[in-house]
């Protein structure tokens, strides 16, 4: 059985510095005052890899699997800001919110039912602050992708704002194409949806985040208005999977 390779701490630090520089350059090309937030996607990565990123100054991490996040969160410093970026089943919402006090955002809210479950979970957990959520939008139209249709995003955001006081709508999220890159029209679509959601919520569009861009396209996303990019393999190396039994 081949043991998975893990990037050395120095490699992780160098990768983070390179990505930050590329984000800054892309943002400057677009005339933006500041680059988007970098969410280090640490799914399937061992704790030493996360610790190396933390030591290099990274504080925002994204996880895709509830149990993996529940296992990792208590072993990382309390000032880590965790984003859940995978598909979340409604029956796991309570465990996620209760088990990760420093959960900052669930980026994959794609139904009123899930929002309601997160609302109940946040109240039960006695969170001091509202839990941030993003409405996940399927901008590519692929049936394999989760997320609401662009036209349905305003209604879901309105439901959360009106019926889920323990949650706060921070913006929108979309997932890249099958090759982990997004076409420009996906980014343009999400920006357009933000305008519609902002109108429905009666807030300025600039107050709503756009979580878009991954390892293959984060520079393009930054140039097109992303406020948060989710980068994993470019920081930690190729994704690691448990060996088959």
Where are the regions a protein language model picked out?
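Conserved alpha/beta-domain cores
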Residues: 2-218, 222-224, 236-238
């Amino acid at each position: 059985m081949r043991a998975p390779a893990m990037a050395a701490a120095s490699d992780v630090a160098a990768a983070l510095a390179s990505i930050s520089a590329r984000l800054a350059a892309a943002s400057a090309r677009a005339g933006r005052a500041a680059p988007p937030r970098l969410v280090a996607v640490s799914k399937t990565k061992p704790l030493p890899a996360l610790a190396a990123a933390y030591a290099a100054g990274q504080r925002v991490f994204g996880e895709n699997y509830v149990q993996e996040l529940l296992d990792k969160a208590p072993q990382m410093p309390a000032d880590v800001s965790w984003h859940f970026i995978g598909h979340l089943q409604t029956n796991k919402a309570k465990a996620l919110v209760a088990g990760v006090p420093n959960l900052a955002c669930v980026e994959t809210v794609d139904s009123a039912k899930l929002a309601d479950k997160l609302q109940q979970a946040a109240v039960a957990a006695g969170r001091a602050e509202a839990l941030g959520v993003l409405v996940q939008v399927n901008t590519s139209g692929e049936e394999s992708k989760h997320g609401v249709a662009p036209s349905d995003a305003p209604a879901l955001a309105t439901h959360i704002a009106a019926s889920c006081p323990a949650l706060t709508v921070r913006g929108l999220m979309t997932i890249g194409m099958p090759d982990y890159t997004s076409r420009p029209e996906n980014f343009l679509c999400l920006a357009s949806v933000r305008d519609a959601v902002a109108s429905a919520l009666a807030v300025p569009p600039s107050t709503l985040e756009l979580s878009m861009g991954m390892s293959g396209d984060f520079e393009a996303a930054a140039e097109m208005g992303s406020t948060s990019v989710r980068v994993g393999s470019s920081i930690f190396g190729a994704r690691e999977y448990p060996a088959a039994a």
